Swiss-Prot record:
Coiled coil: none annotated. Produces ATP from ADP in the presence of a proton gradient across the membrane. The V-type alpha chain is a catalytic subunit. One of its GO terms (molecular function) is proton-transporting ATP synthase activity, rotational mechanism. Keywords: ATP synthesis, ATP-binding, Hydrogen ion transport, Ion transport, Nucleotide-binding, Translocase, Transport. This is V-type ATP synthase alpha chain. The gene is atpA. It catalyses: ATP + H2O + 4 H(+)(in) = ADP + phosphate + 5 H(+)(out). GO terms for biological process: proton motive force-driven plasma membrane ATP synthesis. SUPFAM superfamilies: C-terminal domain of alpha and beta subunits of F1 ATP synthase, N-terminal domain of alpha and beta subunits of F1 ATP synthase, P-loop containing nucleoside triphosphate hydrolases. InterPro entries: ATP-synt_VA_C, ATP-synth_a_Xtn, ATP_synth_asu-like_sf, ATPase_a/bsu_AS, ATPase_F1/V1/A1_a/bsu_N, ATPase_F1/V1/A1_a/bsu_N_sf, ATPase_F1/V1/A1_a/bsu_nucl-bd, ATPase_F1/V1_b/a_C. Belongs to the ATPase alpha/beta chains family.
Length: 578
């Protein structure tokens, strides 16, 4: 008996006669064979969310189960590709159909015509273990390890080499099983690992305010809430360019089409500081704009996460950028409403927190099955309406992530980039990572960080007083706090994304800059206590020199800092003598 549609409600349809279907199984819906996924089963009646536009579907049209869950293709050729939320290759579809895609469009995610030169690292007679590296596949300048699927083991009977397509078998086992360059994996099932490793190595972003004040571990999770115009996209582009990640997976989930078009236009022009080639060469884009079907938006973050886990299994460090989880949650809300489920706060489903937590738990630094150590670090942008951080998506994300990098509209309007609000932001991993920074960046890192945070907190208190009584009414020591905090904000916390030197800052350089800022403040405090007037110190112009430290290369920062220290000592000695 053929299953037939009995109800259609937007992206959600109901079909009778699917008694043998499984939850999360792919179903071909209607005469045009639209892609759908089973999300609820009641006897032989299945509720299906359709990943394409359902306008024009009619009751009584067929629904055909595929027997497989929603899965993605993993293999050589992923890097530099642009997919939609269910891994259809947008470049290839645009070449075939033009700018607007028709319904039922199908193309394999990986190019079957492209040939890869295989250099095997296994031989006939070897015992194959799950996740083992079988060799390297090369095509032009691109080279990628070939992994055995996680569920396959046995004795190798045959190994092929030479130019192969991704769907051709490269290894045949004694039991007849064949392994090709590509493998398929269900998007909602995490890929297996050997064991998780301690999160005691930082995910270096190159941004001083994040690395020094609110660090996140490699394999950790961070959320970036911010309203319109606060710089979420620019920050994520900077992270993609300068963070310590071998591969970047960028998921544009439900953002406006023109914003995604801008990202697609800008990324090929950005230069990768590591290789000198285009940044797109180590990036995978999963694009699902707000005018695409809402159900595919819900699947897109799982597609991106599965691709990230595949590169992690090669022993690589992967940064997974989600922009934004708010749009994903809105898709959940719409699907939940179509299912007539009981709504929670602001109409979001009651399982929003558990779904978010389950997704963020797929991050981690791990020992892979066969390729050593790898990590997936997830950075999720949140777009709270009106910048309200008390709304449900922000609050659920707070409970599931290890760091909050809150973007401030006020700082963004003052041209302060990155516009990270140090009064709201926090990191649960800062203390755990302190030991690494003390070893690798230099002793005293944690103490300097704490001292700088106290200085910024003291500034906030004094600003409130100054707004009431005026800056002139403050004592010299209090006005010095305001001036030192201003220099710290503008010279240390602010970075230019367009300065080739200051765009990324290594930890040792950041430590030297922070130490110098706080040393100058401490010496000035002592000088004022000894009777030196504040205006005499400010007129010397050392502040302007301090603001230019960020533009010094890392190897020259120590020399520049010593010269500034010597100049300060000479100035204060002369002022104290007077």
């Amino acid at each position: 008996m053929t299953a037939r549609l009995v109800r259609i409600a937007g992206p959600t349809v109901v079909a009778d006669g699917l008694a043998g279907a499984a939850l999360n199984e792919v179903v071909w819906v209607g005469e045009e064979r639209l892609l759908g996924e089973v999300i609820r089963l009641e006897g032989d009646r299945a509720t299906i969310q359709v990943y394409e536009e359902t306008a024009g579907l009619a009751l009584g049209e067929p629904a055909e189960p595929s027997g497989e869950p929603l899965a993605v293709e993993l293999g050589p050729g992923l890097l530099g590709s642009v997919f939609d939320g269910v891994q259809r290759p947008l470049d290839a579809l645009a070449a075939q159909q033009g700018d607007f895609l028709g319904r039922g469009a199908r193309l394999p995610a990986l190019d079957r015509a492209r040939r890869w030169e295989l250099e095997p690292s296994v031989r006939r007679g070897d015992d194959l273990v799950p996740g083992a590296c079988l060799g390297v596949a090369r095509s032009g300048a691109e080279a990628q390890p070939l992994l055995a699927p996680p569920h396959v083991r046995g004795r190798i009977a045959e190994v092929r080499s030479g130019a192969l397509a991704v769907d051709e078998p490269v290894v045949r086992l004694a039991d007849g099983a064949e392994i090709a360059l590509l493998q398929r994996w269900p998007v909602r099932r995490p890929r297996p690992i050997r064991r998780r490793l301690a999160p005691d190595v930082p995910f270096l972003t190159g941004q001083r305010v994040l690395d020094c004040f609110f660090p996140v571990s490699a394999g950790g999770t961070a959320m970036v809430p911010g309203g319109f115009g606060t710089g979420k996209t620019v920050l994520e582009q900077s992270l993609a360019k300068h963070a310590a990640a071998d591969v970047v997976v960028y998921v544009g989930c439900g953002e406006r089409g023109n914003e995604m078009a801008e990202v697609l236009d800008e990324l090929p022009k950005l230069e990768d500081p590591r290789s000198g080639g285009p940044l797109l060469g180590r990036t995978v884009l999963v694009v699902n704009t707000s005018n695409m079907p809402v159900a595919a938006r819900e699947a897109s973050i799982y597609t991106g996460c599965t691709i990230a886990e595949y590169f992690r299994d090669m022993g690589r460090s992967v940064a997974l950028m989600i922009d934004s989880t708010s749009r994903w949650a809105e898709a959940l809300r719409e699907i939940s409403a179509r299912l007539e489920e009981m709504p929670g706060e602001e109409g979001y489903p009651t399982y929003l927190a558990s779904r978010l937590a389950r997704f963020y738990e797929r991050a981690g630094r791990v020992e892979t099955l066969g390729c050593g150590e790898g990590a997936v670090t997830i950075v999720g942008a949140v777009s709270p309406p009106g910048g309200d951080l008390s709304e449900p998506v922000t609050q659920c994300s707070l409970r599931a992530t290890g760091a909050l990098w809150a973007l401030s509209a006020d700082l963004a309007h003052r041209r302060h980039y990155p516009a990270v609000d140090w009064a709201i932001s926090f990191s649960l991993e800062a203390e755990r990572l302190r030991g690494w920074f003390e070893r690798e960046a230099g002793e005293g890192f944690g103490a300097l960080r704490d001292e700088a945070m106290k200085l910024l907190q003291r500034e906030r208190e004094l600003v409130e007083v100054a707004e009431l009584v005026g800056t002139e009414s403050l004592q010299d020591a209090e006005r010095l706090v305001l001036e030192s905090a201003r220099l710290l904000r503008e010279g240390f916390l602010r970075q230019s994304a367009y300065d080739p030197v200051d765009a990324s800052c290594p930890p040792r350089k950041a430590l030297e800059m922070l130490r110098l800022h706080l040393e100058l403040h401490g010496r000035a405090v002592n000088a004022i206590a000894g009777g030196v007037p504040l205006h005499s110190i400010l007129e010397a112009g050392l502040g302007a020199r301090l603001l230019r430290l960020g533009s010094l290369p890392a190897e020259a920062i120590a020399r520049g800092a010593e010269a500034l220290r010597a100049e300060l000592e000479g100035l204060l000695a002369r002022l104290e003598a007077e």
